[in-house]
Amino acid sequence: MTCEAEMEQIVSTALTLQEDYIKFTPRNPTMACHTEIIGVFHDIHPTVEKNKEAHRDKLVLQETLVELYSVLGIPQEPQVGKTMKFEEPEQHRGSARFDPLVNSLQLKRPLYEEERRECKRPLVQADEAVAAPSARSRRRTIYSKEQTHFLQNQFDLNPYPDFVNRCRIAKITAIPEPRIQVWFQNRRARHLPRAATSLSPQERKPPGSVGPRSSLCREAQHPEAWSEVLIPSDSQPHPN
């Protein structure tokens, strides 16, 4: 008895559920499936519906403006070929296009290294070119004792040697002629002023003064001239 009572209760509940299901379901099964799909689509893409509504509003506004311009008599450009396109922004493409890090790594970095290498070369060459004259000017000629002694003896003999004498000294000492010229110039600048200042006032004589020794030398060199000058006036015949 208990089993029959339980079976009757199960059948009655199933029938009641079937009646409720028939009341809430539509008559056309395809419409029910379509509504379910649209509901799911609305839940997944709500922004698409918003974009469509905005697009419809713009189209309505455009149509009203066209009607208003036609009523007012304002000429309009042909709208053929003018279509409004709505595209979603490409975030990844835009970020990659305007990303400075990507551009610097792909394009600018190798170019910067090449420019730096090319710029370093002329700078180094310019530094060498600038350093070369200074290095040349700092070089000093080192003379041996024999060369120095020989040059000093030649300076004592003639402080102002000409080109021929300098070439002769250069051939003997194996020193270039320009170096010999510089050596004599430096030697004159150092020693000749000292020699002039070391003389005593008695030894200094004006250039126009002539001593007895110089007069005797002149007399020895030109005896005829001095004999003509020293002839007394009494030796000449007196006119009558």
Swiss-Prot record:
Q: Per its UniProt record, what SUPFAM superfamilies does this chain match?
A: Homeodomain-like
Tree of life domain: Eukaryota
Q: Where in the cell is it found?
A: Nucleus
What start-end ranges are recorded for coiled-coil regions in this protein?
Answer: none
What processes does the entry annotate via GO biological process terms?
Answer: cell differentiation; mesoderm formation; nervous system development; positive regulation of DNA-templated transcription; Spemann organizer formation at the dorsal lip of the blastopore; Wnt signaling pathway
**What is the protein's major site of localization?**
nucleus
Site annotation (Determines DNA-binding specificity) points to 185
Question: What keywords sit in the KW lines?
Answer: Activator, Developmental protein, Differentiation, DNA-binding, Gastrulation, Homeobox, Neurogenesis, Nucleus, Transcription, Transcription regulation, Wnt signaling pathway
Query: What is this protein's function?
Result: Essential for Wnt/beta-catenin-mediated formation of the Spemann organizer and for induction of the organizer precursor, the Nieuwkoop center. Acts as a transcriptional activator, cooperating with TGFbeta signals to induce a program of organizer-specific gene expression and to generate an organizer with both head- and trunk-inducing activity. Activates the head organizer gene cer1 by acting synergistically with otx2 and mix-A/mix.1 through the 5'-TAATCT-3' element of the cer1 promoter. Also binds as a complex with lhx1/lim1 and mix-A/mix.1 to the 3x 5'-TAAT-3' element of the cer1 promoter.
Q: What is this protein called?
A: Homeobox protein siamois
Tell me what organism the protein belongs to: Xenopus tropicalis
The uppermost taxa in this organism's lineage are: Eukaryota, Metazoa, Chordata, Craniata, Vertebrata
